[in-house]
Amino acid sequence: QYAHGNEPGHGTIFLYNYMREPWRTQELCDSILYGLYYAGPNGLSGNEDCGQMSAWYLLNAMGFYQFCPGRPVYTISRPIFGEVSISLPNNRQFTVRTIGNSRQNKYIRRVRLNGVALTTPFFTHEQLMEGGVLEIEMSATPTKWGTDAKPVKLYMPKRPIKPIKPIKPIKPARNR
């Protein structure tokens, strides 16, 4: 049972990308985007804990999601926009552009990142921050795109992640 209003379960549908069955992720994502979010009193299932419900919708509507918080990797889902751009530092932009996207065309046929074919449903945060174009061609029927995924290596960024410095404890104020 999938309960979208229970935020800890939001990543469940993306497990299919890791099991080399990304068409199932695309199908479920489509069902949630169009079935559980809409304009109306019940158009947002569950509660909006710190913006997680909205963040899930916005990222997936653009066609990707950060499956594992803290890991600099995005998994590709089912975009609903024809084109959307994210403004980045240093006048860069990351644009997601779809080809043949429609309500019926919910499956991914092929993906290119800056003109280079992606054969797995993953890209890194580093790639997003470099800017460029993620082009997603859609299909009305499930495809074999992304079925040769080897996500273990994709978890590692090109550069090591810098550890966060520990926060110094705050000393309590003395009563005057």
What does each model-found stretch correspond to?
Residues 38, 68-162, 171-176:
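Beta-rich accessory regions
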Residues 1-95, 100, 126, 133:
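Active-site core of glycosidic bond-cleaving carbohydrate-active enzymes
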